[in-house]
Every structure is written in C-alpha cells, then in structure tokens.
Regions:
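Class I SAM-dependent methyltransferase Rossmann-like catalytic core
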Residues: 1-24
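Adenosine-cofactor binding site in Rossmann-like domains, unifying the SAM/SAH pocket
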Residues: 57, 65, 69, 288-299, ...
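Conserved proline-anchored active-site loop of SAM-dependent methyltransferases
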Residues: 13, 19, 29-43, 54-59, ...
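Class I S-adenosyl-L-methionine-dependent methyltransferase module
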Residues: 46, 50-287
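Long, positively charged, glycine-interspersed low-complexity recognition regions
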Residues: 321-393
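Extended, basic/helix-rich recognition subdomains
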Residues: 188, 192-196, 200-207, 214, ...
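A structural motif corresponding to the C-terminal end of an alpha-helix
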Residues: 258-259, 280-292, 333-342
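Conserved phosphate-coordination/catalytic loops
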Residues: 6-14, 231, 291, 321-325
Length: 393
C-alpha cells in the first residue's frame, strides 16, 4: 500500500485515498490541521485542485513536509540519541517526528534498554561501522535485515549478556534465562504485581489514593489488579516511590523485563523507515501551487470555490498548541462556512451529518482496537455537497 505524508501520530495515511475521493473538484484545497500531510499528499497526486494550502498551528508539520519535497533529507544519516532528541525536538521537525515514539513529536522512540542496540544497528547499516556490534560480542560484517532475522537467538543472547553486565551490572546465566521464557515472563509479571501490592499495603494506601496522587482516573487498577495488568512506566514508578513503599530502583525491579520485551523486533530500525518516507516525497511536483501557513484554523481566509478539510484533535486526546482544543468554538465556526467543509472525527453534534465511515485499526492503542472513522459535513451544506458532486460527474 502506498504511504502518504510523513510519519505522524494519528496520520490519515491508511485512509487518504478513500477520504480524498469524497471531495468534489474546486479551485482551492485547504488542509487546516495538516499534521503529517497525508491528505494533502494524496490530493496533490490527484491534481484536481489549482491551489493547495497546508496549515497547522504546530509550524514543524508543514515545514517538514515542504523540506522533504525539496530534498532536504536526501543525505540525512544522523543517529539521534535520547539526549539529542530532547535538545532538538522543538526546533528540528525531522528529529521530532521521525525519532519519537509513535511519531508523536514528544517522547523518544526507543526505550533506554534497547537504545544501545538500535544505535549499533544504525551504525552498521548507515555507516558500515560494526564496532558497536562487536562490543556486544556479535561478530559479523552483515547486519542486513535478513541476517538479523536469521540469527535472532544469537543476537538476543549476546546483547542481553552485554546489557546485564555493562548497564545492570549483573551476571546472569543467559541460557537458563531463555528456557521457558514465556512462563518465566508470566511468573515474573505476577511477582511484580505482588511487589506493588505489598508496597501499597505497607503504606496503608488504597488504589484510589494512588489515582488521586497521580491525577489519573482508574489507572491504579492496572497496576494492582489482575485484569489488563501493566507495570508503571519508569516516570510513574519513580513518582510512586515518593508515595508508597517501593524500595527497589526501577532498573533493578523491571530493567530485565523491559529489555526482554524490547527485543521482540531486533531487525526493525524505525528511524530509517521514517526517513525513507520523507525521501519519497521528493517526487512530488506542483510546489508553486502549495502554500504553507502556521495559524489557528479560524484565522485562515478561505477563498471562494474551495474545499476545506479538518482533521481535528479528538475529544479527550490531543492538545491544540499545548492547549485544550475548543470543540464548541470549532463547531460554531463550521456552521458559518459557505465553502464545503469536511471533518474527520468519530462523532459530531447533530448539526453535522456523516457522509462516509471507515473501519480503522488504531495501531497506537495498547489493545490495537478497531474503530470507525467518519467524515462529516455541516448539515446546512448537504445540498451544496450533492450539487457539487453532480457537477463532477
């Protein structure tokens, strides 16, 4: 399947072709919450509009798209460390979106446990430098994806041994560790859960107390209950240490478990895959008809004979320029529009009507849940939409 735009959390990449098919021809095309620019990318390929405007209140988004089209990343080879990421993410859009977890522009893409391995893989593939792999005890000059797929046990064993010795400062019997690993992980999970429960009891606290302390709603149930159990993140764990009796450092109690879970896809190097997406954008043309803006959606002047597309932040999830998005203000703005306005969302007020819906799997969800993505227009534009579609036939 062709990929559109650049890697971005919540990207409409998988739905771009279906969504753009809904739009009638017009002179101008506005993508007011452009994000990863997947919709604009598809619209440019279809070439049914004379002028294109990409806008996002986060200036990094439209800039990254245009930089990619202009070939800025043709010779990009940098390895971005965790420290580099947090120093550069606010000023370097490539770093922010191609080196962040889930392409969210906020958190570094690799856990601390797997970062040394990913760095070694990057050096081997990009710089043909195998010295870091040699440090792990992996003696090879072939770190292709295929070689790694064919030698997973050897690599895991040597990397775990290196990590435990050099990072955890622990000597482990790796062969013994690998026996019945699934059962060991399951048993260890229960021991970790019991460790958290004991800390709660020693402190005379209840899960609801933890929720109040963390400012969460029911998350404590995942830490102390059996249903959908999960261990706190390092940040949350270290915060909990100030509230309940959790004596062991995070790395000691969970470091090995996190390492084992991180090693499931050794051959993958997500940063290079993201870079390849950017490089493919160089083939786009019609740049002279593409305008970049960085404003609030309601500050954009919409010209006559236009199509407006809005992929708004969903309620209870994303922020808008680090602020809560005012959905009511947006709904009122839509009702005033005279040019056709299309909105992607799961639900909208009764003044809007759904013109299409698509089954969509959210890969960023811990449950990989299927959702129904809908495209709406304001009800007062329904007759206009039908007329414009008829004119295109």
């Amino acid at each position: 399947m062709k990929k559109y735009g650049f890697p971005y959390k919540g990207s409409k990449n998988k739905l771009a072709e279906k969504i753009v098919k809904l739009f009638p021809d017009a002179e101008n095309f506005y993508d007011l919450f452009c994000g990863g620019c997947a919709i604009t990318h598809r619209a440019l390929i279809e070439d049914r509009w004379k002028n294109y405007v990409i806008n996002d209140i986060d200036s990094r988004c439209p800039k990254l798209f245009l930089d990619a089209i202009n070939g800025k990343f043709k010779n990009e080879t940098r390895w971005i460390s965790r420290e580099d990421f947090y120093n550069l993410k606010d000023t370097d859009a490539y770093v922010a979106f191609c080196w962040s977890f889930g392409n969210n522009g906020k958190g570094y893409m690799y856990s601390k446990e797997i970062e040394p391995y990913k760095k070694a893989l990057h050096y081997a593939r990009v710089f043909n430098d195998f010295s870091l792999f040699n440090d792990f005890g992996v003696k090879t000059s072939d770190c292709s994806r295929m070689w790694i797929i064919e030698h997973p046990d050897e690599i895991k064993q040597k990397y775990i041994l290196w990590y435990c010795k050099n990072i955890l400062h622990s000597e482990l019997d790796i062969l013994e560790l690998q026996k019945n690993l699934t059962e060991k992980v399951k048993k260890n999970n229960e021991e970790l859960r019991q460790y958290l429960i004991n800390g709660l009891k020693k402190s005379n606290k209840r899960p609801c107390d933890v929720d109040r302390f963390l400012g969460t709603n029911g998350m404590a149930g995942h830490y102390f209950g059996k249903s959908q159990w999960e261990f706190p993140t390092r940040e949350v764990y270290e915060k909990l240490q100030t509230f309940i009796c959790l004596e062991k450092p995070y790395l000691e109690i969970y470091g090995l478990q996190e390492l084992l879970e991180s090693l499931q896809s050794l051959q993958s190097l997500q940063s290079l895959e993201s870079l390849e997406r950017l490089e493919r954008l160089q083939s786009l043309e019609r740049l002279e008809r593409l305008e970049r803006l960085c404003k609030s959606y309601d500050e954009i002047e919409i010209k006559p004979n236009s199509i407006i597309y809005c992929d708004i932040p969903y309620k209870g999830t994303d922020k808008y320029n680090n602020l809560d998005f005012d959905h009511e203000a947006f709904f009122n703005w839509c009702k005033k529009q005279t040019e056709l306005c299309f909105i992607s969302s799961y639900e909208m007020p009764e003044d809007f009507i759904s013109i299409a819906e698509f089954n969509h799997r959210c890969t960023l969800s811990c449950k990989n849940q299927a959702t129904i993505e809908k495209v709406f227009i304001p009800k007062h534009q329904l007759d206009l939409y039908k007329a414009r579609l008829s004119a295109c036939i």
